[in-house]
Amino acid sequence: FKRAVKGGYAIPAFNFNNLEQLQAIITAASETKSPVILQVSKGARAYANPILLRYMAEGAVEYAKSLGCNHPEIVLHLDHGDSFELVKGCVDLGFSSVMIDGSSLPYEENIELTKKCVEYAHQFDVTVEAELGVLAEEVIDFSTRTGCDSLAISIGTSHGAYKFKPEQCTRDPKTGRLVPPPLAFDILHEIEEKLPGFPIVLHGSSSVPQEFVNIINKYGGNMPG
């Protein structure tokens, strides 16, 4: 995270459930010489078995080396953990990092749950991603009191490509397609001012319209359409 912040680039995170998806992720990361976060959801753990997923990730490191990547930067991450027990299970299994998503809880309960996960994970040098939502004015208090290592915020992206409700969208008059609501870059800017250099996580990149990809590229990104 520190190198990414200093270098001005983002680290991609991809969910995988099976070998074929993992091969595609590692091949792309190796070809682009990019660090990568391998994400496992609660559902993937139930489907593919957490032990198998852990050793698949270890195999991914060796696979990246075989593709010419001498020092692969690959981590295994729990995506959207919803309980301390789930987070603890992943930490105990050897995950590099975990996410605890308490954003649906009242603010103080979110802090309490996140702090509990952070205190446990940090004993094993495991980093913790937390989720706050859209309240930019609370990011300093939240990050300070929980000790989280990165923070997921909501600026208008959605988890997955088609998870916006129709009433949240507008309809393109030319194509008739539903267009997701615009991204709240003002919130992102405000949070960056409040917590300069703190790792911010944006979920749901598969739903970002091309116009916003163009804006990212305008300010130094390198994302083909």
Predicted regions and their residues:
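Generic N-terminal amphipathic, Lys/Arg-enriched alpha-helix
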Residues: 1-12
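Alpha/beta enzyme core
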Residues: 1-3, 18-44, 51-71, 80-199, ...
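A generic, residue-level signal for flexible/boundary positions that often mark functional hotspots
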Residues: 8-10, 177, 202
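Short acidic/histidine-rich active-site segments
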Residues: 204-207
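Conserved phosphate-binding/catalytic loops in two-lobed NTP-binding clefts
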Residues: 224
